[in-house]
Amino acid sequence: PMWGINYLTKPKFELPQLQDHVSEGTNTATSIGSYFTTMLDQSMNWKDAERLSSKWGGHFALKGIMSVEDAKKAVDIGCTGIMVSNHGGRQLDGARAPFDQLAEIVDAVGDKIDVICEGGIQRGTHMLKALSVGAKACSGGRLYLYALASAGQEGVEKALGIYRTELERDMKLMGCKSIKELNRSCLLYTSPSPRDTLL
């Protein structure tokens, strides 16, 4: 493939702004698994997060919250937002999806902190479901990164436009005129528990 020819014949890929700080900014080969293993700092703890939140002095959100217990800790240390996220399932593909515990986290802390559903959002209908459960917002890297890589800013604007169009169309089909009208009664589950699979 062409990428192989380019790899051999073109100048080596480098990120000069990072190469003095991390080896991942150089042309040193590394596996994705090794890269992410080195990124995970096991020494980070709740006291560190509380100190960061305090020093920041403004809105502060933690990403990677996957349990009610951690959501409550985030409230206790002064976070103003949390991102319910399993980081796209890349590191632990057997982990629950963010949507699977969104309802219980919203029920526990949604009146005290902004809960953002991050990950697995691939369509406007996914945003519609997360907002109906009680998320204040939705987020995702793939939402815009693929569009950015393929078509730059215009691609991102087009992708976001598709999400918005789908969200607005489906809200109209549901008879909702405002995001504020979305709630769990808008959803139909296969069993009484909101943590179970949607139809």
Model segments located where?
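Single conserved hydrophobic/aromatic residue that forms the stacking wall/gate
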Residues: 189-199
